Amino acid sequence: FSRDDGDSPFLRDDKTLYQSCLLCHSNKEMQRGPVLDGMESWYILDQLKKFKNGQRGRDPKNRAEFLMAASMARVRDDHEMLRVADYIGNLKPKDSITTIKGDIDRGKKLYSSCIGCHGAKGEGRQDVKAPALLVQEDWFLLDQLRKYRNGLRGTHPEDIFGRVMVESIRDWSDKDLKDVTVYINSL
């Protein structure tokens, strides 16, 4: 996000606001955060609020989230977050490169415990704040699963649904995480 410098009463358009996000959130190799194009606007807004209020990004051991939380200091207000979230939600998802290898059949069995929140086809459910999984790159899904399992995400006392994720996969091995990621990527 970028803040307008100066006293201009005019807000920049949504695309211009989003441009500063692309330093990390594009498929160019820079900081290489997740590509956000096509993610649901409600989920983007929810996550932006978590970064802004400290539910995410306070642990320097989770470098990517720590950097994201620092960038949120430049966001003016909730309206700016809403505008960016709506803009992202209207972008078409980008094609992604498959990078993770695993056992798809084993992953399907593991995924059966994810269906209640993320849906049989990975479509997600807003009522339990579970995002669709189909637009995210496999390396990022695996990274986030590891962060949940290792307590680097979803542990804030106010992050109820994040804590559900932590508990759901706490005992999963790295092979489990890779296999379920490969299955999700096949949906």
Task: Specify the residue positions occupied by each region the protein language model found.
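Sequence/structural segment immediately N-terminal to covalent heme-attachment motifs in c-type
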Residues: 4-29, 99-123
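The feature marks the first
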Residues: 14-53
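N-terminal export/targeting leaders of redox proteins
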Residues: 1-12, 49, 53, 186
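A charged, solvent-exposed segment within the mature domains of Sec-exported extracytoplasmic proteins
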Residues: 105-152, 167
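Axial heme c-ligation environment in periplasmic c-type cytochrome domains
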Residues: 30-37, 52-82, 88-91, 96-102, ...
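Solvent-exposed, polar/charged alpha-helical surfaces in well-ordered, non-transmembrane soluble domains
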Residues: 15, 19, 42, 46, ...
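Disulfide-stabilized extracellular ectodomain repeats and their linkers
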Residues: 18-21, 33, 41, 65, ...
